[in-house]
Amino acid sequence: VAATGAQSLAAGLGVADEGGNAIDAALAAAFVALATEPGLVSFGGGAFINIWPAESEPVVIDGNVEMPGRGLPHDRFGAGVREIWTDYGGGVLMHAGHGTAATPGCVPALARAHADYAKLSWPRLLEPAIFAARDGYPMGAAGARYLNFVADSLFGDDPEAHRLVTRGDGSLIEPGEVTANPLLADTLIALANE
């Protein structure tokens, strides 16, 4: 199992030890990464999933985001977009705000991979992510580094979002510091029960 952090790895290994297949392990690890790496990956984003079944050709599940209103004249979109410059990665210009929101494709792609290739139940694969979001997880070094650049500029306009990526006093979460997202846990419980 390849994973981005200890909790993701444990989730993947745990379902593999229970008899899950490679897709089960990858999905469990991905769910935990999505729940514990704020800013780096998101359930609200896109995903491309590459699967090569043993007895057939490789498959790519396209879970890219869709832009609502694509094809409409530019003047139909209105305002709500702000430009944010960050020094992260050598310098990146981002666009943020409600005018930049896309329809997420990540969860539908994960659901398709589960329906077509997984062995264990959907709720079982979400359990480790629910636990991590509800009970806490150590902030990874990569996530803390990214949030150091964007916690205020990207998340600062929305007090609720800002609280999710900083401490209660607004200061930055350090690598290894335990944080949680109970509202995400509630959402994942609902997703598990769908």
Protein language model annotation of sequence segments:
Residues 1-10, 14, 22-194:
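Noncatalytic scaffold domains of N-terminal-nucleophile
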